[in-house]
Amino acid sequence: MKKHYRNYFIISKFLVLGLAFSSCSDFLNRETDSYVSKEKTFSSYELTAKNLVSVYELIPDGFMRFSEGGMFDAATDDAEHRIDGSNIQLFNIGSWTDNNNPDDIWNRCYTGIRLASEFIDNVDKVNLDKYKLDPNNTTEYENRLKDLKVWKAEARFLRAYFHFELLKRFGPTPYVSSVLALEANHSDVKRPSMDDCVNAIANECDAAAKDLELTPWRDESALGHATKGAALALKSRLLLYAASPLYVQWQNTDESNLPSSPAKWEKAAKAAKAVIDITQYSLHPSYSSLFKNNFKSSEMIFAKRYNNSADLEKRNFPVSFGGQGGTNPSQNLVDAYEMKDGSLFSWANAQQAAEPYKDRDERLNATLFYNGSNLKNAKVETATDAKDGVNKPNGTKTGYYLRKYLNEDVNVLTASNGLGHTWPIFRLAEMYLNYAEALNEYNPGHADILTYLNAVRQRAHQPALAAGLSQEAMREAIRRERRVELAFEEHRAWDVRRWKIGSKTLGSDLQGLDITATQTGGSGSSSTSGSTTTETIPASEIPAGWYYYDGDEFNGSSIDHHYWGILGDSRTKNAQYGQQQGMVQTYREEQVSMVKENGLSFARITATRNGNPPKSTNKDASKKEPWWSGGLISRETSKYGNEAKYYPLYSRIEIRAKIPWNYGVWMSSWLRHHLGYDVCELDIQEFFVKEFENYPQKYKVSQT
């Protein structure tokens, strides 16, 4: 995980900020009749219903909420994202910061909290007079009155949900139970203790559950709305987290540590059992079919429907089947799946190593594609040079592809629409595992531990665990079961943090599998650091912790040709390129010099005009043009050797440059592909005066 820092640039943000302020001003000054007022919204039954839906929409699904279709498990030891440019990779290289956090839902959560509070404060204002005063429509009036009561409870659930999402990422935050006035002074709001924050969320869950129905009571149009089970499931997850080592050991605001308490585990167990005891829920008969858009399954307690596009399949199918192979499960995860007889898989077992996917827990085949998996009457082939292998464009990095959630009948090459997808937020199997974990921590040996743990295993046709395991052995069995049962449901990242085992998991090497015609063997690449257990609140600070990669500084009395190519210098690979670039200038080596002022060394590029320029002796800058200028290329591959090659996967580049301001001057800064500018070029900054003879006031600054 080497992080690179290159000491290059700071660019002014005046134009960016100016545009942002202009846009905000336009929005705030728009005419009142261009949008629906709050008063009108909450007087209308229909608009109020839509308002509640807008709060639900702030709940993220986990399918493609990171760039390039990244999933959160690709920031754990369970997977890697194939595309290095996905922002999920910031977690893996330790480069996520308070102002560059791919999982930044701080604003999203507080938006949801505010909208939910606003809904709660106003939903009783809905005008139902036309139903109330109609003697022939009293039933509809009673139904709509009940709708408003249930909707308010749903909003309370949503407010609790967003507060929990903040808690699990940032620790305790103030519980906001009303709409905060923008003009009010909130400086006296203090960070609560962990217990106070947890209790506030739990109380909101209880209040919501009291008025929520067990099922969407009206019709199927309410599917996806929160029910009593959803509120109690949220409370279960909340109290399980609150009892876990990370949260128990959280320091209070007075710098004291919370004591470890079996009572917290007992509360977590009771909360999970309350959900289990709701008789309408049952385990889906098939693990593999549960995730094929099974929104109405009796196992789903609360889920979010994803659109019917085939984007998920396009992002994740193996490459020979038209996919982009986005999320690649790791060998670490594969090795966690047991053999069918319940024993652990081992590479030291010659028979198992020879056929690593034979006689394994069936959830392995339901979760990922491996070498030899069946798909569309064909085989997935992940050997290094095979059609889905690592050496193919968009090929897997690990030897595996994601299978869970994907509709395998979709032809991603022709289909614009798929069959829909369901993102499970709470499901019954999690409640079983929550209950088993909490029971094992405060009452090891309780019979219910095996009852519910084995129920999850037996659905996958895994043998029941035998009685008599020690608390430690049972703890490991429960954790392994959570890993495979809940894979790619956004549990792993938070489980390893709350258990405080990140240094052993997130900090370990991420393993893939190299497959050749004659042998198999693991190959590792570095995964994310396990030292960080909570996220940082967004700020505008430059992070520390970068490794400095020197060599590009302008020290000494001359340009170091090992690190810099100079346009116009015949030793430079790209001397011919950019010699004129369609402009009137000629790049010349002598226009670049080293200067030292006030103790600082820097390179100076001088642009001049010579009325009668001599012909240059340099064969690559021989044109007789009156305008002379210079150009530098960092790490340009040159005749000086391979040390000039420097193409980091991730880096922070800083350039400090003083930009001249005069007619005819064009200052530019680019990032170019190592195979040439025609492959890719990013224009970081360009500054030039255009048409200055006719329009001396006209100039242009372009920043990307």
Where do the PLM segments sit?
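Bacterial Sec-dependent N-terminal signal peptides
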Residues: 1-34, 529
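An aromatic- and glycine-enriched ligand-binding surface/loop that stacks and positions planar moieties
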Residues: 25-88, 171-173, 198, 205-207, ...
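Conserved, well-structured interaction surfaces
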Residues: 49, 53, 57-60, 84-170, ...
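Extended glycan-interaction surfaces of carbohydrate-active proteins
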Residues: 204-211, 380-418, 696-703
